[in-house]
Amino acid sequence: MNHGTKIPVDPFRIIKETARDGSTGEVKQLSYTSSKVVGSGSFGVVMQVHLIESDSKAAIKRVLQDKRFKNRELQIMRIMKHPNIVDLIAYYYTTGDNSDEVYLNLVLEFMPETIYRASRLYTRQKLSMPMLEVKLYIYQLLRSLAYIHASGICHRDIKPQNLLLDPENGILKLCDFGSAKILVAGEPNVSYICSRYYRAPELIFGATDYTHAIDIWSTGCVMAELMLGHPLFPGESGIDQLVEIIKILGTPSREQIKTMNPNYMEHRFPQIRPQPLSRVFSRSVPLDALDLLSKMLQYTPTDRLTAAEAMCHPFFDELRDPNTKLHNSRNPDASPRHLPELFNFSPFELSIRPDLNQKLIPSHARDALPVKLDDFVPIPIHRARID
């Protein structure tokens, strides 16, 4: 696949571009050396580069720009600022070998790994990811979703490959907003989004009026995969996928089917009883993990926990304990580390579900907040707007 004029892979050649700042849009000069391709696909190509000005690593994602439309990914990334979302440093346009082709280049914060790769490292050694790491990563994913969902944005492609990690510090950041969209009630959306294995059942049923709850289903699938070492609902097609879901959750009732897509209510499905999750997972998986999973993997979208509700689940209580330390499972000789910042909530985040703040924020973390919880007046949550 031709992705336009290639970014030369030459660690000694300095490339200069006139770019715009990811936050302010101000014009700035960017100088970098490029080292290697770290990803490619139908969207384009991702290069790892070294920024001269800041003496830091970054990733440049290059995508072909359709001149008829504004790039939704760029518009969304420019307004997203969160500790668990990859940061847009700058952006610029280049032309391809064919002068009609215009490429958008997103200069992004660099993270060394994906949760997909981290999970594979354990699987190859016939090990399970330590439960504390599962808690840490899923909590941070939920925190990023609480933030984007409150802004009206649905990611629509939650999967292990789109969850970036800094395994040294236990930090997770959500990336790839190429499928993301501001969902507006009453406006139809395409159902053929989200990668298989992680697709919510309403998408398999072809629903076009789905909600942010599709991201919660995908999160449940990712969490299950980290504990199992393989996808919970593998399937080569939509029907395959549905069969795998039914094998575990049982046949959806007519009422449940109605909440996903009323057009399928008269469809006859084989009657299969649900299987207890305790039979699907090993005995080492704690009951509170299975309880959280069951509350995210519900057929009826409105029955699924919201991201903020899920963060309050007892499964994550260990993260709220000030004595919890993160052991380096890749280097057992290294001394345990403190957990990353998990409670540095902004006033916006504290306004998402003010009724949950007391449960969400442990007492030892409250003094560091930008506001006093007892006196906090929630700010109005405004949905994100893009032209």
Swiss-Prot record:
- What does the sequence similarity comment in the record state about its family? Belongs to the protein kinase superfamily. CMGC Ser/Thr protein kinase family. GSK-3 subfamily.
Q: How is it modified after translation?
A: Autophosphorylated on tyrosine residues.
Q: Where is the Protein kinase domain?
A: 32-316
Give GO MF terms, alphabetically. Answer: ATP binding; protein kinase activity; protein serine kinase activity; protein serine/threonine kinase activity; protein serine/threonine/tyrosine kinase activity; protein tyrosine kinase activity
Q: Which residues carry this modification: Phosphoserine?
A: S191, S335
Please state what class of enzyme this protein is: transferase
Q: Name one Pfam family in it.
A: Pkinase
Q: What is its main location?
A: cytoplasm
Q: Report keywords, A-Z.
A: ATP-binding, Cell cycle, Cell division, Cytoplasm, Kinase, Mitosis, Nucleotide-binding, Nucleus, Phosphoprotein, Serine/threonine-protein kinase, Transferase
Output the GO biological process annotations, alphabetical, semicolon-separated.
Answer: cell differentiation; cell division; positive regulation of chromosome segregation; positive regulation of kinetochore assembly; protein phosphorylation; signal transduction; SREBP signaling pathway
**Subcellular compartments:** Cytoplasm; Nucleus
Q: At which residues is Phosphotyrosine found?
A: Y192
Task: Specify the protein name.
Answer: Protein kinase gsk3
Q: What does UniProt list as catalytic?
A: D157 (proton acceptor)
List the GO terms this entry assigns under cellular component, sorted alphabetically: cytoplasm; cytosol; nucleus
Catalysed transformations (reactions): L-seryl-[protein] + ATP = O-phospho-L-seryl-[protein] + ADP + H(+); L-threonyl-[protein] + ATP = O-phospho-L-threonyl-[protein] + ADP + H(+)
The encoding gene is gsk3
Query: What is the documented function of this protein?
Result: Interacts with cdc14 which is thought to play a role in the initiation and completion of mitosis. Involved in the positive regulation of mis12.
Q: Which PROSITE patterns match?
A: PROTEIN_KINASE_ATP, PROTEIN_KINASE_DOM, PROTEIN_KINASE_ST
Keyword Cell division tagged: yes
PANTHER family assigned: GLYCOGEN SYNTHASE KINASE-3 ALPHA (PTHR24057), PROTEIN KINASE SHAGGY-RELATED (PTHR24057:SF0)
Annotated ATP binding lies at V38, G39, S40, G41, S42, F43, G44, V45, V46, K61
The answer to whether keyword Nucleotide-binding applies is yes
So what EC number does this one have?
Answer: 2.7.11.1
Q: Taxonomic classification, please?
A: Eukaryota, Fungi, Dikarya, Ascomycota, Taphrinomycotina
